[in-house]
């Protein structure tokens, strides 16, 4: 499913509204993923604390959302634009690409909670398509 020009415009506009809360979004989304999908904790076993909102969760949540922001900036060619992140996750971190979809779902949940008036059905569809495209781009080096 490719992103239409309208999807790209919608994603860019929505990101402009929510990016100032990127750290909070990332912390909540990652916290939710670790609680609801406890199998994802295996990637973070080196952290001393995995609880919701803990310092390592906050730090990595911000890192994740910086990556989302980078993807928004490179929305016209996610595969090439995110090649370094794809290689990192595939070869160094060895993250199961199914986890990208899990985290994407949690990001959408947090958008809906934090921005109920801005996260319209139209924005939801475009952001869902964008996060799916982002997950595909990150999975590129797994092939």
Swiss-Prot record:
Cited Gene3D superfamilies: Globins
Cellular component, GO annotation: blood microparticle; haptoglobin-hemoglobin complex; hemoglobin complex
Domain Globin: 2-143
Binding sites annotated in the UniProt record for heme b: 60, 89
SUPFAM superfamilies named among the record's database cross-references: Globin-like (SSF46458)
Record-listed N-acetylserine modification sites: 2
Keyword set includes Nucleotide-binding: no
GO biological process, alphabetically ordered: hydrogen peroxide catabolic process
Organs and tissues of expression: Red blood cells.
One Pfam family this sequence matches: Globin
InterPro entries in alphabetical order: Globin, Globin-like_sf, Globin/Proto, Hemoglobin_a-typ, Hemoglobin_oxygen_transport
GO molecular function: haptoglobin binding; heme binding; metal ion binding; organic acid binding; oxygen binding; oxygen carrier activity; peroxidase activity
Keyword Transport included in the entry's annotation: yes
Keywords (A to Z) from UniProt: Acetylation, Heme, Iron, Metal-binding, Oxygen transport, Transport
Oligomer status and interactors: Hb 2 is a heterotetramer of two alpha-2 and two beta chains.
Family per record: Belongs to the globin family.
Miscellaneous remark of the record: This fish has two hemoglobins: Hb1 and Hb2. They display the Bohr and root effects.
Functional summary from the UniProt entry: Involved in oxygen transport from gills to the various peripheral tissues.
Name of the protein in question: Hemoglobin subunit alpha-2
Lineage, uppermost ranks: Eukaryota, Metazoa, Chordata, Craniata, Vertebrata
Annotated gene: hba2
């Amino acid at each position: 499913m490719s992103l239409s020009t309208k999807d790209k415009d919608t994603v860019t506009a929505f990101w402009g509204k929510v990016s100032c809360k990127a750290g909070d979004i990332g912390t909540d989304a990652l916290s939710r993923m670790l609680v609801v999908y406890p199998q994802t904790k295996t990637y973070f076993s080196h952290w001393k604390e995995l609880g919701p909102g803990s310092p390592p969760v906050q730090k990595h949540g911000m890192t994740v959302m910086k990556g989302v922001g980078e993807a928004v900036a490179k929305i016209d060619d996610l595969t090439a634009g995110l090649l370094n992140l794809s290689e990192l996750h595939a070869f160094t971190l060895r993250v199961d690409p199914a986890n990208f979809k899990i985290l994407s779902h949690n990001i959408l949940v947090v958008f809906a909670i934090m921005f109920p008036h801005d996260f319209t059905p139209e924005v939801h569809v475009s952001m869902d398509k964008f996060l799916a495209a982002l997950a595909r781009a990150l999975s590129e080096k797994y092939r």
